[in-house]
């Protein structure tokens, strides 16, 4: 009798994806983040679903409904903070996952990589719209500032902004549609994740050496299932520590003040995971230029496979490229710090230099360093 795991039309898909999947024998803990992202997505959909049962997307009651969830709904407070801090864990895992792809040359799986960039955009859009829903000061003004950037689009800009707002300012219509999109996007993301995995399983996983590992594969279960469970426990530990000990550490105190269109907060800034983009946006003293730089700071990931000039895939044996990779990491951390600072000297110039360096490292310095390494190895 055939094994149901290998014969059932539905179960055999799961089997070939998570159980009998051949995986390289030497993939490190940096390969854990894919599964962690899947768990983050499931957690966000689950907590979000229960929050949506009690939330009202109306400007008059949105803020009160969030307060009601935290005060009156059974375990509503933990749902709300798991959802808010779960987003932070999601982005930590996302950035580490992308960083892993850059370091080990995983971007040469072009379909998987491009799908990943689309996923990154979708998750960022979802997180932005979710931040608007509690209808606090930072929600309202963040929505106003970011949607207003679209007015920089030549000719159709103003019409575009008013179309997205559903009126002449961020108001009732905006909140309702943002809630609708915020609810539906995670399900679209789930479908895109399936496509991402489909493309990945066409080629199989990369590994730290960057050398094809077809001759040395092991089954995903039990080796990597147990390894992923360890990663999961560590992530849950970090998330619960955050939720139970300092749930507001990563939030903005301004968001505990109900939205007021007549009073602008002194510093309008996004959540920490968008600060690097905010710093790049405001380092250019021109609206359209800033918006282009903002979009390109993420869209640049699409062209990274074209900028790969090294004869080696991974950075494991390339010290020069390694130094530049960690310089890029430090540069992004600098941009994140600058994004949270007021627009004054010396933060402005630091932000501008860090922004220039960010694009220079990716477009010019790294490809040149790779060519240099090829030359030094007489390739």
Swiss-Prot record:
Its cofactor is heme b. The keyword Transport applies. It is found in: Mitochondrion inner membrane. Heme b b566 binds at residues 97, 196. The chain crosses the membrane at residues 33-53, 77-98, 113-133, 178-198, 226-246, 288-308, 320-340, 347-367. One of its GO terms (biological process) is mitochondrial electron transport, ubiquinol to cytochrome c. The keyword Membrane applies. CDD domains: cytochrome_b_C, Cytochrome_b_N. One of its GO terms (molecular function) is ubiquinol-cytochrome-c reductase activity. Its main location: mitochondrion. A ubiquinone binds at residue 201. Heme b b562 binds at residues 83, 182. It is a multi-pass membrane protein. Binds 2 heme b groups non-covalently. GO terms for cellular component: mitochondrial inner membrane; respiratory chain complex III. Pfam families: Cytochrom_B_C, Cytochrome_B. It comes from the Eukaryota. PROSITE patterns: CYTB_CTER (PS51003), CYTB_NTER (PS51002). Keywords: Electron transport, Heme, Iron, Membrane, Metal-binding, Mitochondrion, Mitochondrion inner membrane, Respiratory chain, Transmembrane, Transmembrane helix, Transport, Ubiquinone. Heme 1 (or BL or b562) is low-potential and absorbs at about 562 nm, and heme 2 (or BH or b566) is high-potential and absorbs at about 566 nm. Belongs to the cytochrome b family. Component of the ubiquinol-cytochrome c reductase complex (complex III or cytochrome b-c1 complex) that is part of the mitochondrial respiratory chain. The b-c1 complex mediates electron transfer from ubiquinol to cytochrome c. Contributes to the generation of a proton gradient across the mitochondrial membrane that is then used for ATP synthesis. PANTHER family: CYTOCHROME B. The cytochrome bc1 complex contains 11 subunits: 3 respiratory subunits (MT-CYB, CYC1 and UQCRFS1), 2 core proteins (UQCRC1 and UQCRC2) and 6 low-molecular weight proteins (UQCRH/QCR6, UQCRB/QCR7, UQCRQ/QCR8, UQCR10/QCR9, UQCR11/QCR10 and a cleavage product of UQCRFS1). This cytochrome bc1 complex then forms a dimer. This is Cytochrome b. The lineage of its organism: Eukaryota, Metazoa, Chordata, Craniata, Vertebrata.
């Amino acid at each position: 009798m055939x094994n149901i795991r290998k014969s059932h039309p539905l179960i055999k898909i799961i089997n070939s994806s998570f159980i009998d999947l051949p995986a390289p024998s030497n993939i490190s803990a940096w390969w854990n983040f894919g599964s962690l992202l899947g768990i983050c997505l499931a957690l966000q959909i689950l907590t979000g679903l229960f929050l949506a049962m009690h939330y009202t997307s109306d400007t008059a009651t949105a803020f009160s409904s969030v307060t009601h969830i935290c005060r009156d709904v059974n375990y509503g407070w933990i749902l709300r903070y798991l959802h808010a801090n779960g987003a932070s864990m999601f982005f930590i895992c996302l950035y580490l996952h992308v960083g892993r792809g850059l370091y080990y040359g995983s971007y040469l799986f072009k379909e998987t990589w491009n799908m990943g960039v689309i996923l990154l955009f979708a998750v960022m859009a979802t997180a932005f719209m979710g931040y608007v829903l509690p209808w606090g000061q930072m929600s309202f003004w963040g929505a106003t500032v970011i949607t207003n950037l679209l007015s920089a689009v030549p000719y159709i800009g103003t019409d575009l902004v008013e179309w997205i707002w559903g009126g002449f300012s961020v108001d009732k219509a905006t909140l309702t549609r943002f809630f609708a999109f915020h609810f539906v996007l995670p399900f679209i993301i789930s479908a895109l994740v399936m496509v991402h995995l489909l493309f990945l399983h066409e080629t199989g996983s990369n590994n730290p050496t960057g050398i094809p590992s077809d001759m040395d594969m092991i089954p995903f279960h039990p080796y990597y299932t147990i390894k992923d469970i360890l990663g999961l426990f560590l992530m849950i530990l970090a998330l619960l520590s955050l939720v139970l000990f300092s749930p507001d550490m990563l939030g903005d105190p301004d968001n505990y003040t109900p939205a007021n269109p007549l009073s602008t907060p002194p510093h309008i800034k996004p959540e920490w995971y968008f600060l690097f983009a905010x710093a790049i946006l405001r380092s250019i003293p021109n609206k359209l230029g800033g918006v282009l730089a903002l979009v390109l700071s993420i869209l640049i990931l699409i062209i990274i496979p074209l900028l790969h000039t090294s004869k080696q895939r991974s950075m494991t044996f390339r010290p020069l490229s390694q130094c530049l990779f960690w310089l890029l990491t430090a540069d992004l951390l600098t941009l994140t710090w600058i994004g949270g600072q007021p627009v004054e000297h010396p933060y402005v110039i630091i932000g501008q230099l860090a922004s220039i360096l960010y694009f220079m490292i990716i477009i010019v310095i790294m490809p040149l360093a790779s060519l240099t390494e090829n030359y030094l190895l007489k390739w």
